[in-house]
Amino acid sequence: MAGSHPYFNLPDSTHPSPPSAPPSLRWCQRCQPSDATNGLLVALLGGGLPAGFVGPLSRMAYQASNLPSLELLICRCLFHLPIALPLKLHGDPLLGPPDIRGRACFCALLNVLSIGCAYSAVQVVPAGNAATVRKGSSTVCSAILTLCLESQGLSGYDWCGLLGSILGLIIIVGPGLWTLQEGTMGVYTALGYVQAFLGGLALSLGLLVYRSLHFPSCLPTVAFLSGLVGLLGSVPGLFVLQTPVLPSDLLSWSCVGAVGILALVSFTCVGYAVTKAHPALVCAVLHSEVVVALILQYYVLHETVAPSDIMGAGIVLGSIAIITARNLSCERTGKVEE
């Protein structure tokens, strides 16, 4: 049967061979970005970059009108509720299929806890440092949890980029941890870093639970549940733990609206990306949020950016480049005729 294999057929001189396609056409037909590459690019452009604006804008809203973190979380959750409309139009259950409804609600709860910790941390910790600790802890926890629970390993280049990004985050946040002020302010700052770490841990757990959900309307259902669970938990907590504030200036309302829109875009893109690529790599690419937050921290909030911040941001960008270049693979789309 070897003679019938296309690799063993000799060219027939009596029948002219068909004209070959142009090289550019053959390349387009033969190669396309892999699913992992598409996921990482979506996480970079749609997840990390918009999320980098969320922390500084939240801090601006707090500085302008002392907007509590739970009130900001409520405003963000309100942007998730309109997702119920397309779910109802398609006839999908708002809370997901009955057999996995519990896991979907648990995933939404983890997302809300992660967001709430992030908003609380950014009020007492510089926006860049809060994003650094949150993304660093989410990356490490995602790598460990995925390796232990899903037995999904990483290549050498992926580990190089992953460890490099974590090193960059340590360089950014390390000096700030060693120079904490004594007294009440130092305690609040330390608690802010702890909240940022817990936010990253909740984020990694939420991504892992989300990957275990398999039904057609998974992403919009979890997005709607995140808004619903966030409202049910934040509204009572706001009146018990904090004092509601009604912003009276245009800047605060603009920041709140921008935070809601950008956060929803980032949430959607990360939810798509984590189904295409390794969760740890998605979290590592999301470190671009730190770079954006540091830029806004310096130019918009006029807060100090140390040389170590610039050095760490450069290492983070280099690590993201390594991970992205490693996953810029091509998939063969055409099949060999037999």
UniProtKB/Swiss-Prot annotation:
InterPro entries: EamA_dom (IPR000620). Signal peptide: none annotated. Residues 1-21 are annotated as: Disordered. One of its GO terms (cellular component) is membrane. The chain crosses the membrane at residues 37-57, 67-87, 105-125, 160-180, 190-210, 221-241, 250-270, 281-301, 305-325. It comes from the Eukaryota. Residues 49-174, 272-325 form the EamA domain. It is found in: Membrane. SUPFAM superfamilies: Multidrug resistance efflux transporter EmrE. The keyword Transmembrane helix applies. Keywords: Membrane, Repeat, Transmembrane, Transmembrane helix. It is a multi-pass membrane protein. The keyword Transmembrane helix applies. The gene encoding this protein appears to have arisen by SVA-mediated retrotransposition of the SLC35G6 gene in the primate lineage. Belongs to the SLC35G solute transporter family. This is Solute carrier family 35 member G5. It comes from Pan troglodytes (Chimpanzee).
